[in-house]
Amino acid sequence: CISIVLIIKKISPIYSLILGAIVGGLLAGWGLEQTVVEMVSGVKDITPAIVRILAAGVLTGMLVKTGSAETIARSIIKALGEKYIYLALALSAMLLTAMGVFIDVAVITIAPIAIITGNNLKLSKMKLLLAMIGGGKCGNILSPNPNTIIAAENFNAPLSFVMAAGVIPALIGLAVTVFVIVPLM
């Protein structure tokens, strides 16, 4: 609670978390030495997950900066054609986010293609955006994002297993987005 209040007050999140942990340890009756030992132990346990998260961020940057993300999106839209534009946009966003690209970056990457195609076909921008965001959320179920990485660490499960467990829910979400939600708009 102390950490959250300090962060809201614009205190550096790192210092806020450290101070919150120290106060929490002292209130638990650990004393300063035991509190510091527990803090170091906690950091040691979570460090591999943090390194994986940073690596996913580097991959995301490379996909966007090299133009690979846009190439993937254009290829999917070209393959499926204008008739299936909503599916193509949702699938593009899903695949990009499944590779670790954040939803906002995926949408910004795909949006210019969506807008041009949507204007040519006189489609609703809201439906185009909904398809991209829905697809992005489906990709998040599969991606090596911080939630997935930490879940794998905490359950002592291989990251690939946790990611694979999301395939069926992601595909169901994609189908619902494209064939149920978008047409209702």
How does the language model describe each region?
Residues 1-5, 22-26, 54, 91, ...:
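Generic alpha-helical transmembrane segments of integral inner-membrane proteins
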Residues 18-25, 110-114, 134:
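Hydrophobic transmembrane alpha-helices of multi-pass, membrane-embedded glycosylation machinery
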